[in-house]
Structure formats: C-alpha cells, structure tokens
C-alpha cells in the first residue's frame, strides 16, 4: 500500500506538469493561428479574433484554476514570438492571464454550467465571460502602449476597442466549441448526415461568396446560422459562426468585398460588428433551443412517470397484494 501511495504521489506532479504544458501549447498554437490575420489601426496591430482567450477560459472551466500557470506560460510564449522581452511586456502578460481567471471566477459565481443547457448560461458567457472580463486585458494592453509612447493618446480608444472585441470574440466562439467537444455526439441517422452535409455545402459556397462580394450581402449568412442552430444546436451554429467570422476576417485584412474602399477604422468597426452579432446570435439562439429541448424532455419524462403511477393506482400494485 505504501508503494502505491508513493507511486501516486510521484504520478500527480508529472500529470500536473503534463497538463500545464498541454494548456500552454494549446494557448500558443491558438495564438499563432490568431496572428495569421491582423488589422492595423494607428500603427497598433491587433487581431479581430483572439482564440487564446477562448482556449484559456475553456481550460479554466474544465480543469479549474490549477491550469493558470499553463495559461501564463502560453501567453509568455506568444509574446516572445512577436517581440523581445522587457519589463513592460509583463503588464500585458498579467492582463492576458488575469482576464480569463476573472471570467472563470465570475462564471462560477453565477452557477455557470459547461453544458450551456440554459439561456442564463449563454447570457453569463456573453456578458461576464466575454464582455466584462476582457476589459482587463484590453485596458492593460492599450494602456501600456500609451504609457510607453508606442501609441498616441488620441488613438487609445480605437485600439482599446479593437483589442477588447478581439479578446471577447475568442471567448464567444472558441470557448463554447471546446466545452461542447467533450459531449457532442455525431448523428447516426443517415438523414441527419445528409442534412449536415447539405448545410455544410451551403455554408461552404455562400459564406465565401458574400464575404468577398463588393455588394453588401453579409445578411445572407443569418438564415444558414438559424438553420444550423435549429437542427444541430451549438455544434452547428458555433461552427457556422466560426467559419463566417474567419472568412469575414480574411476579407477585411485583404480589404476586399464589403470591406473595400474603407479606412482602417471603418474596416475594424464593420468587421467587429459583424463578428460580434454573428457570435451573439449563434450562442443565444442555440442556448434557447437547447433549454426548450431540455424542458420538453423533462415534461415528457414527468408525464411518463405520472402515467406509470396512475397505472399502479388503477390496477393495483402486485407487491402490496393488490388485485385488478
């Protein structure tokens, strides 16, 4: 028994170190993906969607605060990959680590469920996990640029807004996908597969077309989003929102389609408004549909139990000697 205890004691630190490295690697990989598409406003570079914030919040919700060192390590690796280390950089590191931690604490405070089965869970993720908590990282990052004279004071708010929305978008799109990845089940019905393939084909054709067309047709994506939410709930709607946001970001960084002939600030505002409303609609619509489905299942189960009770009352319970 003592040998087993010692083995477990040796195993736990190793497992924790592996978890920390995995979280750091996931954060760093998501950061490198996010840096593939950048926008420049008044000389400051930021990403319209910053996936590492979504990875960080999801890891905290799944594993708890013990993964915070992994998040900090991943953030440090991302910073080291784009700039040299100096004392002021650690302010950004603190902001990038503290924002997901605050998101986790606020979500736990209100009883957030990782299955996103209630409308209140979707609202909590939007307003607490994304919009409120990411104020920290945006303020630390943009504020540091101003204090170090790398950004003019009059440019603070545009850069701060872009930073804030980019971090929030990472939470709104990436976090739900990672949380649902543990519970999603592929449809076994052939008809469901056919519908899923048809929806994917429609999205694959229409979304690139409208995001790269100079005529403003972005609204055509919303029927596809509603279809995905109604039939496939979170798995369908969030994947649709992610693909649409990525394609819109590509068009915006290339200044093509509906983002052509616009200033950098106008491109940022239009892109962030589209991405934000897309993610918000997908998340809340799927939450409402899932909650209604769970309510219907609960009512059906209650009716079934009531029918069984009535059957015992009218026919008699054989275990108590009753006769029909």
Language-model features: locations:
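Heptad-repeat alpha-helical coiled-coil signal-transmission segments
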Residues: 285-288, 292-299, 303-306, 310-313
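Alpha-helical transmembrane segments that form the membrane-embedded catalytic/substrate-binding core
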Residues: 158, 162-174
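Juxtamembrane helix-entry segments on the extracytoplasmic side of multipass membrane proteins
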Residues: 153-157
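Short helix-perturbing small/polar motifs within transmembrane alpha-helices
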Residues: 1-48, 54-150, 175-243, 250-292
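Cytosolic, intrinsically disordered low-complexity tails and loops
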Residues: 310-324
């Amino acid at each position: 028994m003592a040998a087993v205890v010692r083995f477990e004691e040796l195993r736990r630190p190793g497992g924790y170190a592996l978890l920390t490295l995995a979280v750091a690697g996931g954060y760093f990989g998501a950061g490198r993906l996010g840096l593939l598409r950048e926008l420049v406003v008044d000389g400051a570079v930021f990403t319209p969607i910053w996936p590492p914030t979504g990875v960080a919040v999801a890891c905290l919700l799944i594993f708890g605060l013990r993964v915070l060192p992994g998040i900090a390590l991943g953030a440090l690796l991302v910073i080291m990959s784009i700039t040299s280390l100096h004392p002021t950089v650690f302010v950004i590191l603190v902001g990038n680590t503290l924002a997901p931690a605050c998101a986790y604490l606020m979500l736990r405070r209100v009883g957030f469920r990782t299955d996103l089965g209630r409308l209140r869970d979707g609202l909590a993720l939007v307003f607490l996990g994304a919009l409120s908590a990411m104020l920290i990282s945006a303020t630390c990052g943009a504020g540091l640029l101003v204090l170090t004279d790398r950004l003019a004071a009059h440019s603070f708010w545009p850069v701060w807004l872009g930073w804030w929305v980019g971090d929030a978008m990472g939470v709104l799109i990436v976090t739900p996908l990672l949380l649902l990845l543990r519970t999603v089940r592929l449809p076994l019905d052939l008809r469901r597969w056919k519908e899923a393939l048809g929806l994917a084909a429609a999205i694959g054709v229409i979304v690139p077309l409208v995001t790269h067309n100079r005529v403003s047709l972005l609204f055509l994506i919303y029927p596809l989003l509603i279809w995905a939410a109604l039939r496939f709930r979170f798995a369908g709607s969030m994947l649709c929102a992610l693909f649409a946001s990525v394609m819109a970001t590509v068009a915006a960084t290339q200044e093509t389609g509906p983002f052509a002939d616009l200033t950098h600030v106008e491109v940022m505002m239009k892109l962030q408004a589209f991405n934000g409303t897309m993610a918000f609609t997908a998340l809340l619509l799927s939450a409402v549909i899932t909650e209604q489905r769970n309510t219907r299942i609960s009512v059906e189960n209650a009716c079934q139990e009531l029918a069984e009770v009535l059957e015992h009352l009218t026919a008699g319970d054989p275990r108590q000697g009753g006769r029909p």
